[in-house]
Amino acid sequence: MVTILDRINPDAKRVRHPEKAHRPDTEVLRKPDWIRVKAPTSKGYAETRSIVKEHKLVTVCEEAGCPNIGECWEKKHATFMIMGEICTRACAFCNVATGKPNALDMAEPENIAKAVKEMGLSHVVITSVDRDDLADGGAEHFEKVIWAIRAASPMTTIEILTPDFLKKPGALERVVAAKPDVFNHNMETVPGNYLTVRPGARYFHSVRLLQRVKELDPTMFTKSGIMVGLGEERNEVLQLMDDLRTADVDFLTIGQYLQPTRKHHQVMSFVTPEEFKSYETVAYTKGFLMVASSPLTRSSHHAGDDFARLRAAREKKILLAAE
């Protein structure tokens, strides 16, 4: 049996995933050559880690065990995770700890803004744990973080990756009103997998949330991502693309699911680079402005460069429509 301990405070010996303790161990498949990455050792990585720790911040890069952390942190790119490191959901794929969250850190918005300014970020990604325990799901905290970054670094573009705000009336409207540049909400997987992979969420609620963002602010870029290798069929992925285009989503990311521990959902397959390229081609034909599809693609990987390309793609589309 594997006991998963909290990495944030190892002295506490708190079980990191108590909801998964009863599950039988599953085999962790050997990764193919195309998905292996080097351990992070660069000077830039160390500097980014130092800034994160200095401001007592949490990053999804660390909490989710992202394979791209070495590359991103070397370039001083980081995705900040707000509202603590404990999530109220228990998704079968996720390495973020589950449990009863702590009270919100009221200094967090200012601390993030200081880190963004110190790192000289032209584009920042802010995500969060699910906070079903809060009346607004954390919408006000998102709002405060966006405002603080705008005040400290007016030229920095802001991308948010939000939870679904399920049963939190008015929460989405509040976050959209804060005017992030990109609103990202990940679908994570195809609808047939939701019961086992993402049991606390509702597929069509997430689709509707993305659609509602565009209704509230048609100029705001919307983005969503999925993992493959969870047992989905190709036609299910193509249908998900259609659902997202119906919601007028601009940007789709597709990446390989990697199993954090033996207690998490098993990797059912490693999708080849050629299959990822095929998904990208199909997605563009369906009308997405931007598509990132590769084994190591993650929601915030190359987010700054992708935002510039996304903006250019929209401008090109507008010019073509005017001809």
Swiss-Prot record:
One of its GO terms (cellular component) is cytoplasm. Pfam families: LIAS_N, Radical_SAM. PROSITE patterns: RADICAL_SAM. Its EC number is 2.8.1.8. Binds 2 [4Fe-4S] clusters per subunit. One cluster is coordinated with 3 cysteines and an exchangeable S-adenosyl-L-methionine. It comes from the Bacteria. Pathway: Protein modification; protein lipoylation via endogenous pathway; protein N(6)-(lipoyl)lysine from octanoyl-[acyl-carrier-protein]: step 2/2. It is found in: Cytoplasm. Belongs to the radical SAM superfamily. Lipoyl synthase family. This is Lipoyl synthase. The gene is lipA.
